[in-house]
Regions:
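Active-site glycine- and acidic-residue-rich loops that bind
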Residues: 32-40, 100-113, 133-136, 203
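C-terminal/domain-terminus segments
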Residues: 192, 199-220
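Short, well-ordered coil/turn segments that N-cap beta-strands
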Residues: 10-12, 65-67, 95-96, 121-125, ...
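Active-site pocket-lining/capping segments in soluble small-molecule metabolic enzymes
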Residues: 19, 32-62, 72-77, 84, ...
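Catalytic beta/alpha-barrel core
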Residues: 15-16, 96-105, 174-176, 197-202
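Flexible, glycine-rich active-site loops centered on histidine and acidic residues
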Residues: 1-43
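Conserved, mostly hydrophobic/aromatic
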Residues: 6, 90, 94, 127, ...
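Catalytic cores of alpha/beta
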Residues: 1-7, 81-88, 111-117, 134-140, ...
Length: 220
């Protein structure tokens, strides 16, 4: 479905993403296509809004869509300066809000926010929260998902929860621990006013989101 169709049916918020390399997907042999990338998408939408023309220069008789445009950033990246520079490009190209990749270490997230502030980049940032389900899930993301760094102590806690569950015949202890850890991070982000909000990537376990928010003390 095109962006125009989304706008017509009332969806007025858009997240511009370049996308991951196909090597981490279901068809690793396919060719990556980054035309346009996230910055290009933002520039295209912003130009459409300003000129009332599509990307080919044709006037839009019904008026250009005006999306609340967003983009993403990886707070854990080496060298982090590349992400700061890319973030600046995205904001200057029209991004009004930013969603981060999953974060698991609030101290490193704070350092990233300090760098954003020092660079003079003004935008609304939402921290990405991924509730972990198992130690294997955390290890897989560390090895295969760019910009993700789950600390070893979290992995060890999940492994210990699995061992305890096996010993006592209790299912789901690692997932319960993942819910607790996600709630703890959200509560700290809220209480310390670290950023403008969070977005929870539950990855097939969306039913747990209300529980996570409740444990974090968040009322909607």
């Amino acid at each position: 479905m095109s962006g125009f169709t989304h706008y017509i049916i009332g969806i007025d918020t858009m997240l511009a993403l370049t996308g991951d390399h196909p090597v981490v997907g279901d068809c690793p042999e396919s060719k990556p296509v980054y035309d346009p990338d996230s910055v290009g998408i933002l520039k295209m939408l912003t130009k459409m809004e300003q000129t009332n023309c599509d990307c080919g220069g044709n006037e839009l008789s019904g008026g250009a869509p005006h999306f609340y445009k967003g983009a993403s950033v990886a707070p854990v990246y080496d060298p982090i300066e590349l992400q700061i520079n890319k973030l600046r490009q995205k904001v200057e190209s029209g991004a009004m809000y930013i969603q981060t990749r999953g974060i698991f270490d609030l101290d490193s997230f704070k350092r990233f926010l300090d760098l954003v502030d020092a660079a003079g980049i003004k935008t609304h940032i939402m921290a990405g929260i991924i509730p972990l389900k198992a130690a294997g899930m955390a290890k897989y993301m560390n090895e295969n998902v760019l910009g993700i760094d789950v600390p070893q102590d979290m992995i060890d806690r999940l492994a210990a929860a699995a061992a305890e569950g096996k010993e006592k015949g209790i299912k789901g202890l690692p997932m319960q621990l993942g819910i607790e850890m996600a709630a703890e991070m959200i509560a700290r982000i809220h209480d310390e006013h670290l950023c403008d909000g969070v977005h929870i990537m539950a990855i097939g376990a969306e039913k747990n989101v209300p529980t996570i928010l409740d444990k974090a003390g968040i009322r909607i």
